[in-house]
Each structure stands twice: as structure tokens, then as C-alpha cells.
Amino acid sequence: MAAAAGGPCVRSSRELWTILLGRSALRELNQIEAELNKYWQRLLEGLSYYKPPSPSSAERVKANKDVASPLKELGLRVSKFLGLDEEQSVQLLQCYLQEDYRGTRDSLKTVLQDERQSQALTLKIADYYYEERTCILRCVLHLLTYFQDERHPYRAEYADCVDKLEKELVLKYRQQFEELYRTEAPTWETHGNLMTERQVSRWLVQCLREQSMLLEIIFLYYAYFEMAPSDLLVLTKMFKEQGFGSRQTSRHLVGGTMDPFVDRIGYFSALILVEGMDIESLHKYALDDRRELHQFAQDGLICQDMDRAMLTLGDIPHHAPVLLAWALLRHTLSPEETSSVVRKIGGTAIQLNVFQYLTRLLRSLASGGNDCTTSTACMCVYGLLSFALTSLELHTLGNQQDVIDTACEVLADPSLPELFWGTEPTSGLGIILDSVCGMFPHLLSPLLQLLRALVSGKSTAKKVYSFLDKMSFYNELHKHKPHDVLSHEDGTLWRRQTPKLLYPLGGQTNLRIPQGTVGQVMLDDRAYLVRWEYSYSSWTLFTCEIEMLLHVVSTADVIQHCQRVKPIIDLVHKVISTDLSIADCLLPITSRIYMLLQRLTTVISPPVNVIASCVNCLTVLAARNPAKVWTDLRHTGFLPFVAHPVSNMTQMISAEGMNAGGYGSLLMNSEQPQGEYGVTIAFLRLVTTLVKGQLGSTQSQGLVPCVMFVLKEMLPSYHKWRYNSHGVRELIGCLILELIHAILNLCQETELHSSHTPSLPSLCICSLAYTEAGQTVISIMGIGVDTIDMVMAAQPRSDGPEGQGQGQLLIKTVKLAFSVTNNVIRLKPPSNVVSPLEQALTQHGAHGNNLIAVLAKYIYHRHDPALPRLAIQLLKRLATVAPMSVYACLGSDAAAIRDAFLTRLQSKIEDMRIKVMILEFLTVAVETQPGLIELFLNLEVKDGSNGSKEFSLGVWSCLHVVLELIDSQQQDRYWCPPLLHRAAIAFLHALWQDRRDSAMLVLRTKPKFWENLTSPLFGTLSPPSETSEPSVLETCALIMKIICLEIYYVVKGSLDQSLKDTLKKFSSEKRFAYWSGYVKSLAVYMADTEGSSCTSLLEYQMLVSAWRILLIIAASHADVMHLTDMAVRRQLFLDVLDGTKALLLVAASVNCLRLGSMMCTLLLILLRQWKRELGAVEKILGPLTEILEGVLQADQQLMEKTKAKVFSAFITVLQMKELRVGDIPQYSQLVLNVCETLQEEVIALFDQTRHSLASDSAAEDKDSMETDDCPRPRHKDQRDGVCVLGLHLAKELCEVDEDGDSWLQVTRRLPILPTLLTTLEVSLRMKQNLHFTEAALHLLLTLARTQQGATAVAGAGITQSICLPLLSVYQLSSNGTGQTPSTSRKSLDAPSWPGVYRLSMSLMERLLKTLRYNFLTEALDFVGVHQERTLQCLNAVKTVQSLACLEEADHTVGFILQLSHFRKEWHFHLPQLMRDVQVNLGYLCQACTSLLHSRKMLQHYLQNKNGDGLPSAVTPRAQRPSTTTTTTTTTTALATPAGCSSKQPTADTEASEQRALHTVQYGLLKILSRTLAALRHFTPDVCQILLDQSLDLAEYNFLFALSFTTPTFDSEVAPSFGTLLATVNVALNMLGELDKKKESLTQAVGLSTQAEGTRTLKSLLMFTMENCFYLLISQAVRYLRDPAVHPRDKQRMKQELSSELSTLLSSLSRYFRRGAPSSPAAGVLPSPQGKATSLSKASPESQEPLIQLVQAFVRHVQR
């Protein structure tokens, strides 16, 4: 880019100036030294560094091939116009283009070709040239200012440079001064057509400014180095010739605007001559009586020449101090010789009003500019004044007040009052003090004016206080002799005969001159001035004076008394503002100020200046004790106030009921008409101080009317008021913005929207956003860079970096406007309506004159680096929040502004903070400003060889700079400190995050890009306790995130080789372990400091967050990241665990808890990812238990999510390995903790459910248009919520506790079960809290395993909680949480209301199984309540084979199986239901057999019918098997809600269909086996029916019809013997298929190995067959023994049975010979009675009894 700017150029003088000020990137001592060593010659040459044109130089320019010819031409024209050397002109042009040119390089070509544009450019270069010249002088001034200042960091470097300059500096600068005032003004003949009158005037201003600066340098030089007498003579003659600035060669051109410069030349001329006379050392020699040692005492000839020269002076004021000084010098050194000359010279000086002149001089110098020059001038004048007062009689020096004024100006230098109090009171300024004391308190003002000037530091303030506290004389004036005094003979002494009360109206505080007091009398203008010898404290006297004013306030004397009181108040203000501790002693005065304010504001024409002084005093007091000042002030009615408290913002903004107070009426009636605003300035400072002192406290609400007054009455209109003095308008604007800035800066975002009554910040935000106050702020921001530059250029003194001129005030105001606007936008509550402020900020104006363009152009400002920085910050804010295109707003200037941004960004000496802000702005723009970021990326596109587009970086691409900033290979990277490096990395991160592919593409191709980018990750950081630069952590965090984004988005194989190498290096150099250890040490450090001393919390959070993402990516892309070592993984996990533990144990620190919560997430993820590799579970459980305890002690609202994470981690750990109670540390305490948490959570859920129920019913009555503004609390029933996870954790812990003792103790200590069941009941009734309900049932199910647990659950009232409420689950309309039909196991396990019903059924089954008769009544109640659903479910299997339906049938049959053990009791209580269940079980058996028999039909069913929910619920079968009916009612009965898609799955392959089929088959088989087991309890026991003749057959119904045909699937045939035989056949066939391994049905079982699956299936099939045979035999004998059955039917049955069973037996025998499994009957079910127990042995031979039994039965039948 430098090349683009027209070649490299030397360091400009302005850059050198910036470096010396310490505002550049070069801030190290050695860098400053190097710069001074390099450029000291230029400083020595001064203005003569710039040479006049010469032919040889022109030739060299023409011959130079490195410079483009158009630039040469322009350079030569510039050379002629400025009268500057051609080579230097070209160099100047190049520097200008680099630093100040406001166009693009492309536009430069057109500018050079266009005559008018190139003329305008030449004029701008002239301005630049003038500033360059000035900057050389500024540099020298700066060196002279600080080279002896011990406090300055570069003092030694400056001193070395001044040593080099010392010898020749003054000589050269004096010559330059002479040249300047003798130079002829340029004309158009000599300098070309461009030299118009205006340009000549501009030149002359520059000439005068340079003269004044040269003289200032010479003056400062002579303050440090002695002037030879000969030099004084030369200078005197030179200044005389030049008329002390007034006799310029071009004086005919000097206009009124140039007078300040001419005056300055005169002032410095006079000061240089006075300084040259060395009056200070003369004073010392005179005191020591060694006058001959003074240099002028030794050089009589020069003294005579000087005398002659001095006698010719005296016609202009500038001569006065020179004449006075010379008269003193001659009078001291040779009083006899020169008495007449001295008298004449001295008289002339007095006639010229020397002291008035000196006062003017000092005020002019103090009004802005270099403090050092001002204080040096003060020292110079102090010496002169002290010596004059010591040497001459005071009355000979003219008007005493003038001397006092000069003394006060002199004492403005802080060091001089200290000096004064250290000197003899009889010499120097002590003489004036003594003189004014002689008139005190008759004349108050002179003494107080002088003492006010004598207060500069705390020690001097105490001296002034003591001085006034111990007065020994009281002076008063009498026109006539009082009658109560005795006079001495000669009348010079009076003695009081009676005591005198000095203030008759003074009240309690008073002064009394006692009887007998003596007073000296002086007659003065026919009046007696009496000096009473009376000791008193002036402070008491002042109190009396104020008291007097309060008494006369409504009389005509008020003005006179105000003149006496104002100096008192001013002195008090100065004393307490210097040393606030004295305020306590001055309480009698300060406490009366409030009353004074109250009284004075009501006077007809109020004394505005006194009121302003009073307010200033209160401002100082408010800094110390705002609450007291505010309370006392409120009673005075001075400040604006409201009659009634304001409750809302609308009232506030409208200023409803507001009273402007005493101040408001003063402003309207006195200040605005007069154009003087002392009270307004004081008022604004007071309110700002009060705001800073008590914002956030309750009293800040009382300040609302004051702030409202400022926002409504002052800010919108202050610029339209009438003003007498220049600069007051700007000051008021600045103070108003300072007030708003203080309010917005001190407020917390949390406070902003929390309070109900509007606060000060929200008032400011609302006013600025929605009223005309905001428009004023916008107009301030819109002043623009050109206006500011103009004001700065017009200042007589723009040299001081800390100057207080108009320009600096304007810059400060604009900066405040930026900051205020930025804060208003940041803090404004979100709204759908665009506020007028935002509208004005973002609207597009014609010709780029909108505010965005104005803001962007502040980049051209050079005086104060904070101004462009704040402008860019505001742009950044607007680019983030406002819906507009910055690029469009910039219009045609966009590219030029881009160039300016990049020029400053790439400059090696630019202030680092501006660079950071530019990069932050671009970082935001990546996401929000696509057009703008394309402009800055400046990517050039060309077509690649293979037809794809190739991108490359344009010349003006910001990526050049960014790549340079991250280049770790470069040496001496002073220009890239950590903050800037971080900003560059953040910009790259934004590109990656926003997926700017073209930019990423280019960056990836850059050599060593990944190496440079990641180099910080390979460094070693200092420990957290010593980290001085936290931005390094943020840098590393962003780099980690970039790597993660790259790995995540780029296909594994396509990663750059360079990145792969870097990742490999990261792993091989053990950086995982390093960073893991560092993050852990951060956590430990945070925990140790309890998060309190941590200033870099944000960076810590960023690093932890990035490390978390990196580890997550590394865990999922282990091969890419080379994180495959199990030991490393284990170590990383343990580090995370330790770090989390350290943080979460600091329950008192919110910061620690937040960071701990972040690490807890990582802990959980790693635990799940690496659970097989983490080794001993016990090592993890210990820290986890501690973490849980820490979390439970912390703020529960804050820890809600963290608690859930810890619970989740516990669940994961407990599932990793089967544990016993002894394996878990503090198991019982852990259980108690979990249950206590659960107790609270469940109660909260209960309350929330009830509340939502109440609010839902209330909401129905509300108008539908009403919206609820308050955010709803997070619902407790979350799948990952604490409550649900707590229940799951409790379940896991319960499973560990085999005998249930620990749980029994907990249930005794805590009412957890009743609470749980109550909430469960409400949830079921309302069909709400699905996740909770499911988790609670799982826990209860686990508890019910053990006898104790089951007893506890039953005892807590489980039936009442579940039985009736469960009806709601399938009777209420589904609220969208229904289950979609699916054949996948995963979706079946997802929480659903049908799942809740199934779980309830399982719970009942388990409780009945565990408690048996103790739970029977409840079980019968349950089956009675849910009988319809039970029967529907049994019937539905035939129609719907969805997993949900099969699962429910399985659970239902399981419950019936348990209940069937209690046949008699069931029959007694619910005979009809029992019969219906028996019938339906038979039909279910038939349906299962049919579906298992015909696989193709089942597959067809699955494909076509199961997409729908149950279209028709099959009604339960009637009692008699023969009459069966079906109705097609449309109630949604079972598992799936209607309306789900019935399309065939498109993407499912055959394999997945097969899997689904096998899952359904397995489900049907389970249902079938349980159905048969249950039916077995409803049929007579085989042994009993065969052997017991007395068996009551009526107890047992027929379960199967006497039919042997295999039933077809569609026909509604009653279940028969054919059904049972078919079932045996199906089971046998399936066994055969299993042996042949034809089908992979074993996978559906869900066991880990195929062998286990096969074993399970075989057992199940054998169990089914055994039960079939058992039922067959039992039912056959039941038929045979029943007399009601016709013998013919019995005979037919015997025949059919024997033939069918014989066939089956032969098949069975064949199967057993091959080897068959054992029956699981003994394990799964209560053993069948009698012989059947012998059927379930393990060895194949033992299977023969089954065959024997069947054979025996066949023989029995055949008889």
C-alpha cells in the first residue's frame, strides 16, 4: 500500500510531533531516542529545513524515474506556489498523499488531469505544508518544555537532544525570525495565479504564527540558559526595529483577525528582554550586597548602549515591562550615575500602565497553550514584580489595584504561592499583602483577591486559613469622630470607652470590640482610618457579613453588600476546592450558603455572579457529601422540582407538574436577556457532581426534575441563546453532555429496566431517542472534521497537546456526543418502533452528507486520536444495531474512506487504539455489512485454468495488514502489541464464522498462514496470577475457534496440509496437556481469589468456552486432531473434573459459578464421549459428589442448569459400570441430597402446574389482543431439567441399593413419596408434565423391586394417585404429545402419554408381584377402572401391530398374568370382567398365532395399515365365545393418535423392513407366551382334574371351542383347540428356522450376542409350546368330564386330538433328537403345579417327560 501511495516517503514533521507526544506506537525510551537521533538536525535547522527552489533541484526531480510524471508536474507547481525546493515539494506531495489526501489513488489521476481540481489540491497541500512547518517548531517547544521535568518519562532522551541543539539553536532561530518579519508577501506574479488575496492572508497568518512560535522557543531557551549582555542589545535593537511585532514588512496586509498573533509577538519580545536582564539573580545579589557579580555590572559600554536604546522606547505598551526592568537594573547597579535616566525610563513605564499590561500579557498566555510557557512567564514577571516592590515605594508604582491584579495573575503558577509563603513578609509580594491588610476589613476585596491567588496546594490553603483566622488589627473608617472614644492629645490614638458590637444585625455569631481597646488613627481624605488592636478570626467576620446580607436582602443595600460577600464566597470556594478538610472549619459560612441562594434568587434583579459563586461552593461540598448537600439544597427551591412524584416516563418527558425552581427563573429572566451564564455553568457542574456522587441511591430520583430541565429546556435550545462572550456556548454544550455522559456511564444495564419508577438513565435514553434533545446531539456530531480542523488552525496557539483552546473544547464536545449516542443506542430497550434518533443517524442523505459519512470522515482528524476512535466505535455500534448499509451511506466517498482507514491501519507509528477500533469495526461489518466488507476485502477475481474462479488480494485489501499483524516471523513487533494482535485474530475469526469463503480461500493459500495463525498456541503463558495482558488469552481462544470451524466445515480429506501438520504438531508437542493444565490452573486461580480480584473474567470465559469447543471437536474428530491416546484423554478429563470442582465449590462467587457451569458442560460431554476409556468410576464419583454439594449450596436460580448437568453426569457415571452401595462414597448422604433437591423441585412443579391451570382459565377471559410482557419462567418439566434428571438419578441410585435400606431411611426422613404422588396425580389429571410423569413412574417402578420399597410406595397411596387420574391420559384429547407410529425402538422409548399408561400398568404388575395379597384390592380396583382400555388393548393386536400397541398389550397381559394368580378373589369381585378377559385372551392368542404363522400377511399389514392410528376400536368380546361382534366406533383407543401419514416409507430399504418385521414378531411372541401363561391359571390344574374327582368344574369356564380346524386370519371364529394346535405348529416351525439360522430374528431380542438371543428365543418358544400342551390337555379333560357335553362330541374330540397330537409328537421327537432348549417357565413364571415342573430341566434328555406327558394323554384319550 505504501507503494500505491506513491513510493516511500521520509518521516513527516507531524509524525515526529505525534511520536514525541507519545501518541504513536513508538513509546519505548529507545524508540524515542532513535527518532531524536535521526531527526535532531531537522529540529536544529527549524524552518530553514525547507529550502527555496533551485534549478539543480528541478533537474533532479525531472530525472527521477521513481516518481510518476503527473506527480512531478504537480510537485513543480507546488514548488512555485510555496516557494519551496522542488525535491522537497515532491516529497511533501508524497507525504500529503500518504497522510492527508482524501481521495483514492485512482481518483488522483483525474484530479491531476483536471485544472480546477489540481488547483484545489495544491491549496490543500499548502495547508499541509504550513502545518509541517509549525510541527517542527512544536517539536522543539515540546523538548524545551519537558527536558528538565523529572516527571516526564522521556526526560533523559529530550535532555540529550537539547544538549545537541543548545549551541546553535537560538542563533539559527533568531535569523529565521528576522527573515520572516522582513519577508515580502507573495504575489501572483511571483507565486502563480493561485496566490489570491485570501491565500496571501493565509500565508501572513502562518508567518505571524511562526514568528510567535520562534519567539516562544527563544524565550523558553533563555529561561534555561543565560543570555549574554551583547545578545540582549542585539535583540533589543531587533525588536525595536520590528516594533515588537507591529512593524512587519507586510504590515499593510495585517487584518483584525491577526491581532492576537501580533500581540503574542509583542508579549514574547518583551518577556525575552526582561528574562535577558536576569532580574531574579539581580535581586539575590542586591539582598546579599554583591551587585558587582551581576553580568551587567561588568559591561559598562553595553549598559550605555542599552540606556540609549531604552530612551527611544516608550511609544507602545509592549515597552513598559522592558523599561521597568531596565530602570530597576540600572538603579540597582549604579544608582548615582543614572538617576535621571532611571527616573525617566521608570516614569515612562508607569505611564504606560506597566502592571495593567503585565496582567493582560499573563491572561493572554494562560488562555490556552503551553503550560510551561505560561509558568515560565509567571516566574519572569514574579521576579520583576518582587524586585520592583522591594526596591521602590508601593505608592510610586501607580494604581495599587493594578499591582494586585498582576500579582494575582503571577500567582496562578502553582509553585509561586509556595515560594511566597516561604519568603520574608517584608519583601517582594509580602509588601502588597501587608498593604492590603492595612485596609481590612474596611476594604475586603483586595486582601481576599490576593489570598485567593495565594492558595495553590493543601499547605498553602491551610496557611491562608490560619492567616485569616488570627487577625490582630481591625481597620474601620469614620467620617466623624464617635462620641464613645477617648482621643490622645495629638489625635493619633483612640481608646474605646464602651464595647462595640461590630454587626448589630449579625445574630448569634458576632464580633465585639471590648472596652479599652486602643486604635491608631490616620487622617485620609477628611476621614479617620482607625486601626484597632483587636484580635479576631476573619472567618467569623465573614459569617457576620453573610448574615448581614441575609438581613438586607430585600433593601436597596443588597448590591453593595453583595460586592463585599462575593470575594468571601470565592475565597471559600478556592480554599475548600484545594483542601476539602478545611470545609469542616468553615461550616458556619457554608451552611449559610443555602439560605443565601434562596434569598438572592428572589431579589428583583438577582446578583447573578454571587449566586454562581455560591453554587460553585456547593459543587465542591457535593463531591464530598452529596446526600447532605442534596437534602439541604432541596429545601431552598433553587433547583427544578416536581409537585407530585412522577410515576411513568410519559409524565416525565412531558415535564408535567414540573417547576423550574429558582434557577429556572434566573435563567429565563436574568441570564438569557443579559447573555451571561455564570449560574448555568455552575448549575450544570453541581448537578453532574450530585449525579456522580449518588447515582443508584434512592435520592437520585430527586435529581430527575433537574436532569429533565436540562434535557427539555436547555439542550434543545442552548445554541440559540444570546451570548456576550466567545466560547461560553461551546462550554455549556460540553457541560450538558458531560452530565448525560456521567448518568449513562455510571448506570448498570441491570438497573436500567428493573425499577418500576423511571430512573435517570432511562430518562436520558428516552429523551435523547424520542425528543428534540437527540437532534441537538446529532447536530453536534455532524460538525464534521473540516470545521474542527478550521477552528484548530485559527487558534493563535494550537501547539499544546493539553491546551484548553476553542478547538480542544469543540473536540471534547464532539467526543462526548459520540459517547452519549453510543450509550443511548446500547442501553435503549428493544422496540419495534425506530426512534427519531436512530432514524436521523441512519437515513441516507443526498451527496453523502448523511451522518454516517460524516462519522466515517472523522478518520481524517489528526489532532486527537480519541476523536476518530470514538467515531469508529459509534459506527461499529450502528453497523450492529441499525438496519442500514454503511456502504450505501458512504456513497462515492466509500473507496477513499476505505483507503484512509487502511492507511491508518497499516501505519507503523499510528496509535494502537485506533487500529484496534478499526479492526473491531471491520469484525462487526463481516456479519452485518456485506457491501462494506467486500470493499475492505478488495478481492480480485479471475477465471482459473479449470473454469473455476480464482481470488487474489487487491492492492487495497485489509487482509494485507491482517496477515502482517499475525506474522510471527517478523522481528521487533513493537507495532503489533497483544491487543492489536487480538483484534486481527478476531477479524479472521469473524470471516470464518460468517463463512466468507472467497476470503478464506485466499487466506488458506497464503504461505505459512496456519503456522502464523496458530503460533500463540505453541507459546508458554505466564501463570494466571501474573498475567498482565489478558488479551493473549482471548487471542488463543479465537484461534482455537477458527481451527474448530475449519475442521467442522471442511471435509476431512480437504484440510490444508499445513493445517494437518499444525494439528499433528499440536498433539506431538503435548499442547493438549499444556492447555488442559492451563485451563485447570485458571479455574484454580479463580477459585483461590473467589473471582473477586479477577479483572479479566471475560477473557477467562472466552478461553474456557473455546477450549470446550476444541475438546468437543477433538473428541468427535479424534483422528484429525490426533487425540487418540487414551492416557491423554483420561488426563484431559480429570483436569476438567478438577477445574470444575475447584470453581463450583466457591458457592459465594457468581463469577466462579458461571465459569464452573461452562466447564461442567464440557465435563458432561467428555464423560459421554469417552466413558469407556476413563478407567475407575470411583475416581470420578468422589469429585462429582463434592461438586454436587457445592452446587446445592450456591444460588439455586443461577445453578439451575448446572445442577441438571451434574445430575446428568452422575447418571452417566452410574450407568458405566454396575456398582454396589459400598462403591459410592457417602452414598446415603448423596441419596439424601438428591431427594432433598427433588422434594423442592417437585413442590415447585406442583405449584407451577396449579398456577398455570389457574392462569389458563383466567386467560380464557382475557382479550385475545392482550400480550403478556413479562417473560415466563422456564417450565420445570423439561426433559433436561433438574426435576426430571433428578428423578432419573434417584432411579439409578435406587438400582444400586439392592435391599433398599438407604431408600427406606430417606423416605422416613423426607416426605418425598407423598409429594411425588400428589404431583403425579395433578399431572395425570391435567395431562401435563409428561417428562416428569414418566421419570417419576420409572423411579417408583425401580423402588417397587424390593419388598420394603414396594410397601413404601403402596403405603404412600399409589392407587389413589394413579388409578382414576390415569383415565385422563387416554380420554382427554391428545395435545400433540402423542406417539407417531414407528417401528423404531428409539421413538417408542421417547416420552409419550401412552407410554405413561404402559408404565403405570408395569408398576401395578410389579407391586402385585412383590406384595401379592397386600396389594390385591388395589390391583382389582385398577383393573376394574381401566377394564375398557384393557379389553380394547387385547383386541387391538389383531388390527394394529405398531410397537406401541404391542408394548401396551405386552404390559397388559403381564398385569393380567399376575392377577390371574388370584383367580378366586378376582372372580368374587369382578366376575364379568374376568370372563371377558378370559374370552379376549383366547382371541389374542389366536390373533398372535395367525400373525406369526403368515409372515407375508404380517408384512403387508405393517406396510399398509400401521400408518394409521386405530381406525376402529375393537370392542371387547362378549362372554360367550359363539357370539362375537365388532363395531366400528371412532374413539382413538390405543397407542397412536389418528392423522399420521400412511404413506409407505420411501427411503427405507428392505433390510430395515425386515428388522421392523422381526421386532413385531418378537413382540407378538412375548405377548403370546404371556397370554398362554395367564390362560393356564384359568384352566384346571392337570393333575387335579385327572386325579381329583371332587373338583368343581363350574369354577372353570371353557376357554377353547371344540373345533380342530386351523382358523383363518380374517374370520371371526372363536378360539378353539385348532388354535392351540396351530400355535404349537408355529412354535415348532420357528424353532426349526432358528436352528437353520435362516432368519435374524435374534437381533430383535436386543441382547449383545447372537447366541444369547437364540437361547432366549428358544426358551420362549419352548415355554409357549409347553403352555399350549398344558392348556390343551387341561381343557380336553375339562370337556371330557363335563356331563353337559354330548358324548358324540367327546368321541369326535378324542379322535381328532389323538391324530393331531400324534402328528405333533413325531415332529417334536424329531426336534428333540437334534437337541432342544429348556423351557423358561420356571424362571419367568410361577411354576405350574404338578408334573409340569419336571418339564423344565436343562439337558436334552430331560425334555422327554414333555413327550411322555403328551403320549400318556394320547393313550388316555384313545381309551
From Swiss-Prot:
GO biological process annotation, one example: nucleocytoplasmic transport
Main location: nucleus
Localisation per UniProt entry: Nucleus, Nuclear pore complex
Compositionally skewed regions (Basic and acidic residues) per UniProt: 1259-1277
Skewed-composition ranges (Polar residues): 1539-1549, 1730-1742
Modified residues (Phosphoserine): 1719, 1727
Family, as annotated: Belongs to the Nup188 family.
UniProt cross-references to PANTHER family, sorted A to Z: NUCLEOPORIN NUP188, NUCLEOPORIN NUP188 HOMOLOG
Protein name from the UniProt record: Nucleoporin NUP188
Organism this protein belongs to: Mus musculus
